[in-house]
């Protein structure tokens, strides 16, 4: 592969690419000018053309770009490399601002490799993909900082058929040593996981992928994402759902659980600026697919504020720099004018995180028990009165006695205060003496809190206890 990458290259007509790269050098200086220590270094995806957007990148002050290299364009026939495409990348190496670091995401299987005209079909032979990306690493050398191996391999949109952790793990195992042999300093990334897909990552570890990547890439620009990065939901087991922005922390937890304290690179984050109706996923037809331009700017600030609190997230790339067609997530409008988010990114790149507010709400509701009093003694029916307050809204209060359910109070409107009261006749039938009454409250984000009090059941003389709980 390395020999053929140095051979004369056949000319091909240039199509609209997803591409770009870097002029190496001045790296130490640029790192000194980057965001403060511990904060994610910002960048943008160049998804529109081979135009390096030199003026915009200089104005933004970011020193990272992410681009796509489509295998089917670069090697349309086995061993036959497109001179035009290679030249386009190499031209960018010299046109991008000095010190720019480049992530190249290698996608797009050629038909000769799979027999399919759909370039999102995964490689039939991982060694073919490895040979190609290894050849790129040798050809591009230090001009490319990192290689992202595939894109959203956990999604059938990018991995035709069903996502296959074992097959993708094989791709990593084949590619990693080849890239490192060609360019030892290159960082090898797990392809961006759709919406922080930590269950898929767990399966990669089970399939032996540990040791075959240097960092895990995640994507948080999920379909119809219109909530603040501070907002999240939890699964019933307490873990954040993958589509929550902050679920990159669950990705990190999976890595640590597998003894793999490597960094995370967020290679796509964004919010669309549109009032059009959602057309994708579970929420299709049920809500808007985007936010206002000012909300986008606010969410950008909040996102980088959260990332600054987690130094294991080293790089965070906005997708894309400029709106293109139906994709209106850019910092620039299609005509090149600046959205408010451009200034927000510029401020972060120059001054770092300036927010001081909390990144999300992680505490459960405040529970107030009006009755009974702690260590109260009762006989017969027991009056119970409880309320829970939470700025995110309260969805449920659960009452338990000695770990057994008494009842739930629920309200799917998630009021800021939820209350419940009853005269519990079942209290007459619990065991005599000391009992523990527990109150559990859950907010809209599925944050949970609980409090318990002790009550003493004094039975009437002559009453025989019938065990209920």
Whereabouts are the PLM-identified features?
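Short, acidic/polar
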Residues: 46-59, 128-136, 198-206, 297-306
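Long, low-complexity serine/threonine/glycine- and acidic-rich segments characteristic of extracellular
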Residues: 360-462
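Boundary/entry segment of secreted carbohydrate-active catalytic domains
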Residues: 38-70
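Bacterial N-terminal signal peptides
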Residues: 19-34
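Noncatalytic carbohydrate-binding groove/subsite architecture in carbohydrate-active enzymes
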Residues: 126, 130, 164-294
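N-terminal secretory signal peptides that target proteins for export/translocation
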Residues: 1-14
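Aromatic-rich peripheral "rim/lid" segments of glycoside hydrolase catalytic domains that contact
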Residues: 153, 281, 285-368, 446
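Substrate-binding cleft and catalytic face of glycoside hydrolase catalytic domains
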Residues: 60-196, 271-274, 319, 324
């Amino acid at each position: 592969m390395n020999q053929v990458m140095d051979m004369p290259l056949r000319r091909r007509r240039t199509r609209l690419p997803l591409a770009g790269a870097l002029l190496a050098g001045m790296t130490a200086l640029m790192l000194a000018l980057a965001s403060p220590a511990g904060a994610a270094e910002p960048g943008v995806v160049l998804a529109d053309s081979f135009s390096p957007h030199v003026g915009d990148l200089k104005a933004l002050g970011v020193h990272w770009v992410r681009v796509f290299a489509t295998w089917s364009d670069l090697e349309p026939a086995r061993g036959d490399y497109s001179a035009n495409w290679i030249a386009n990348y190499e031209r960018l190496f010299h046109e991008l601002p000095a010190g720019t670091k480049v992530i190249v995401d290698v996608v797009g299987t050629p038909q000769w490799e799979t027999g399919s005209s759909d370039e999102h079909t995964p490689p039939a032979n991982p060694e073919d993909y490895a040979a190609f990306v290894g050849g790129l690493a040798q050809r591009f050398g230090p001009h490319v900082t990192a290689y992202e191996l595939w894109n959203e391999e956990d999604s059938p949109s990018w991995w035709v058929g069903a996502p296959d952790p074992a097959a993708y793990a094989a791709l990593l195992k084949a590619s990693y040593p080849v890239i490192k042999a060609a360019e030892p300093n290159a960082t090898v990334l797990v392809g961006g996981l759709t919406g922080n897909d930590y269950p898929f990552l767990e399966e990669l570890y089970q399939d032996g992928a540990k040791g075959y990547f240097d960092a895990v890439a995640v994507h948080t620009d999920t379909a119809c994402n219109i909530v603040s990065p501070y907002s999240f939901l939890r699964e019933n087991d307490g873990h954040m759902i993958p589509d929550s922005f902050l679920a990159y922390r669950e990705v990190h937890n999976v890595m640590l659980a597998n003894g793999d304290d490597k960094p995370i690179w967020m290679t796509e984050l964004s919010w669309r600026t549109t009032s059009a109706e959602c057309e994708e996923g579970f929420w299709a037809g049920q809500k808007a697919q985007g936010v206002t331009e000012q909300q986008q700017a606010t969410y950008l600030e909040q996102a980088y504020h959260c990332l600054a609190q987690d130094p294991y997230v080293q790089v965070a790339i906005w997708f894309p720099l400029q709106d293109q067609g139906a994709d209106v997530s850019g910092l620039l409008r299609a005509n090149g004018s600046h959205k408010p988010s451009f200034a927000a990114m510029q401020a972060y790149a120059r001054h770092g995180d300036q927010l001081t507010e909390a990144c999300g709400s992680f505490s459960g509701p405040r529970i107030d028990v009006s009755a009974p009093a702690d260590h109260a003694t009762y006989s017969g029916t027991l009056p119970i009165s409880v309320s829970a307050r939470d700025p995110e809204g309260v969805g449920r209060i659960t009452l338990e006695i000695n770990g057994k359910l008494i009842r739930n109070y629920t309200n799917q409107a998630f009021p800021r205060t939820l209350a419940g009261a009853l005269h519990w006749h079942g209290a007459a039938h619990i065991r005599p003496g000391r009992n523990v009454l527990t109150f559990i409250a859950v907010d809209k984000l599925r944050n949970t809190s609980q409090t318990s009090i002790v009550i003493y059941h004094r039975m009437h003389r002559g009453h025989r206890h019938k065990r209920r709980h």
